[in-house]
Amino acid sequence: MTHTLIWTLNSPEKLSSLSKTLIEDEKYSCFVSKTSLFEIAIKKNLGKLYFYSSFEDLQKELSTLKIEFLEIELGHLEFYLSLPQIPIHKDPFDRLIISTAAVENLKIITKDEKFNLYQDIVETVW
């Protein structure tokens, strides 16, 4: 999911046509979990990602695209605790994004096939 945000802003040619439509067409609502922002902050801090000088600039860009932020809520964290432990997928950021999408009844736009491990919990599109 975080890669979808990065590609939307830096490399839109990497997005599938369906993903672009879902993100850009105003008849759809599009959200980004603040979990993704935390993941971006970590990658920036480690020098693994060069992405916007500030989160305020990022927020302005997302608002032009009509993309809204999802706060991390207690219900998302409670759901996180109930997610099945899958040995080949332990990424805490992905798991919190999955929990958020499940609680909010949202689809996840991702190319990451590991999200398919949770197909009984959330729907993914690419």
Language-model features: locations:
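Alpha-helix capping/helix-boundary segments
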Residues: 4, 36-37, 76, 97, ...
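Charged phosphate-binding loop/patch that engages nucleotide di/tri-phosphates or the phosphate backbone
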Residues: 103, 107-109, 113-126
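Generic structural signal for small/hydrophobic residues in well-ordered secondary structure
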Residues: 2-3, 40, 80, 101
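Short, well-structured N-terminal submotif of metal-dependent ribonuclease cores
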Residues: 1-32, 48-60, 118-119
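Active-site neighborhoods of divalent-metal-dependent phosphate/nucleic-acid chemistry enzymes
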Residues: 52, 64-111
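A secondary-structure boundary/capping signal
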Residues: 1-2, 33, 73, 111
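General small-molecule cofactor/ligand-binding pocket signal
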Residues: 31, 70, 123-125
